[in-house]
A protein has these predicted regions:
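Membrane-interfacial amphipathic/re-entrant helices at transmembrane-helix boundaries
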Residues: 1-20, 48, 54-60, 131-136
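Membrane-embedded helix boundary and interhelical linker motif in transport proteins
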Residues: 28-83, 128, 237-238, 262
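Transmembrane alpha-helical segments in multi-pass inner-membrane proteins
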Residues: 194-272
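Loop-to-transmembrane alpha-helix initiation sites
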Residues: 87-89, 116, 138-143, 215-222, ...
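Helix-loop-helix "hairpin" substructures at the membrane interface of multi-pass membrane proteins
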Residues: 72, 135-215, 220
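Cytosolic-side transmembrane-helix boundaries in multi-pass membrane proteins
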Residues: 170-177, 181-184, 256-310
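Alpha-helical transmembrane segments within multi-pass membrane transporters and channels
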Residues: 57-96, 101, 146-147, 248-249, ...
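Transmembrane helix-bundle core of multi-pass membrane transporters
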Residues: 87, 91, 98-158, 188, ...
Length: 310
C-alpha cells in the first residue's frame, strides 16, 4: 500500500466532498435545518455541470451547477417557510423530485461519459504543465474552491444577514420578537448551502469525468459523518476554526474510507463503514461528558469500600 498515493487520493476527494460538508455546516449547524435533499442536489450539480461542460463551457458549468443548487435550496425553503412542511419531510420531497429532474437533465440517461470533455481540471493541468505542481492539478483546483468557500462563510456569517441566519438557527422566536422575519434568512441560508452542494457535485463529476444517477447517494450521511468528526477533532470556536474543522473531518472520513477500499473490503460493506463512523462521531462527545461522572462514581465506590474495610 503506497501511503503517499493513499493520502493524496483521500485529500483530493475529501476537498471536493468538504464543500458539501460546509453546505451542511451552514444549513444544519448554523440554520438548524436538517436538509435531506443533499443527495439529489449533489447529483443535480453533477448533472448540470457535466451537461454544460460537454457543451464546451467547463467554467460556466460551475456557475450553472451552483445556480441549480440555489433553485433546489429555494424550493426546499419554500416548502418549509410558506407551506408549513417540516424540514425533514421537505428535504425528502425535494430529493424524490430531483431524481426525475436529474434523469431529464442527463437526457434520459442514467450515465454520462466525459472522457473527451474539457474540464476545469484538464485546463488546470495544461496551465501547470512543466511546473512542480503539474501532478497536483486536481488538488490545487479543489483547494482553491474550498478556500474560497471558507473565506466566503467566514465573512458572510459576520454580516447583518449572516448574523440573522445564525440567530434564526439559535432562536427563531427571539428573531420574530426583534421584528425580523425568519423566512428570508432561512431561504437565503438554504440557497447558499445548496449552491455549495451543487458546486461539490460539479467538481466531482469533472474530476472523475463521468456522472451516474446515483453519484450523490449517501452523500448526506458522508457529509454528516464528516461534520461530526470535524466537531470532535477541532471542537467549537470561531466560524473560521469550525469551517476548517469541517474540512479536517472530511479528510479523516475519506482517509478511513480509502483505507477500507485499499484493503479490498467488499463494496457492499462501505455503507456499514459510513454508519459506524457516524455512530462513533455522535457518541464520542456524549462519552466525553460521561467520563468525568464515571470517574467520580468509581472513586466514590472505591472510597466506600475502603470505609467498609475499616
Amino acid at each position: 500500500m503506497n501511503i503517499l498515493s493513499l493520502v493524496q487520493t483521500a485529500l483530493e476527494l475529501s476537498l471536493i466532498c468538504s464543500l458539501t460538508v460546509l453546505a451542511l455546516f451552514l444549513s444544519y449547524s448554523m440554520l438548524n435545518v436538517c436538509d435531506l435533499s443533499t443527495d439529489g442536489c449533489f447529483t443535480l450539480g453533477a448533472a448540470v455541470g457535466a451537461m454544460v461542460a460537454i457543451a464546451g463551457h467547463p467554467y460556466l458549468a460551475i456557475l450553472a451547477a451552483m445556480g441549480a443548487g440555489v433553485l433546489s435550496g429555494f424550493i426546499a425553503a419554500l416548502l418549509q417557510t410558506k407551506m408549513g412542511i417540516d424540514s425533514l419531510l421537505a428535504g425528502i420531497i425535494v430529493n424524490t423530485g430531483l431524481y426525475s429532474i436529474n434523469i431529464a437533465v442527463m437526457g434520459g440517461s442514467s450515465l454520462l461519459n466525459m472522457n473527451k470533455t474539457e474540464t476545469v481540471f484538464t485546463k488546470a493541468r495544461a496551465l501547470l504543465q512543466g511546473t512542480f505542481l503539474a501532478e497536483q492539478y486536481k488538488l490545487l483546483v479543489a483547494a482553491i474552491a474550498v478556500i474560497a468557500v471558507i473565506v466566503f462563510l467566514a465573512l458572510f456569517l459576520h454580516t447583518r444577514l449572516g448574523l440573522a441566519i445564525r440567530a434564526t438557527g439559535d432562536n427563531p422566536d427571539m428573531v420574530r420578537s426583534s421584528s425580523i422575519n425568519p423566512t428570508f434568512p432561512t431561504i437565503v441560508g438554504l440557497c447558499v448551502a445548496n449552491a455549495f452542494t451543487g458546486l461539490s457535485g460539479c467538481l466531482l463529476a469533472q474530476s472523475q469525468k463521468s456522472v451516474s444517477i446515483d453519484i450523490g447517494t449517501g452523500m448526506v450521511t458522508i457529509a454528516l459523518a464528516s461534520l461530526l468528526m470535524g466537531q470532535v477533532l477541532l471542537g467549537k470556536g470561531s466560524i473560521l476554526k469550525r469551517a476548517i474543522g469541517m474540512v479536517v473531518g472530511a479528510f479523516a472520513f475519506r482517509l478511513v474510507y480509502t483505507i477500507a477500499l485499499r484493503l479490498d473490503m467488499p463494496a457492499f460493506m462501505l455503507k456499514l463503514v459510513s454508519s459506524v463512523i457516524v455512530v462513533l462521531a455522535i457518541a464520542t462527545p456524549y462519552f466525553k461528558k460521561q467520563l468525568p461522572m464515571l470517574r467520580r462514581r468509581m472513586a466514590a465506590r472505591k472510597e466506600a469500600r475502603l470505609h467498609a474495610e475499616d
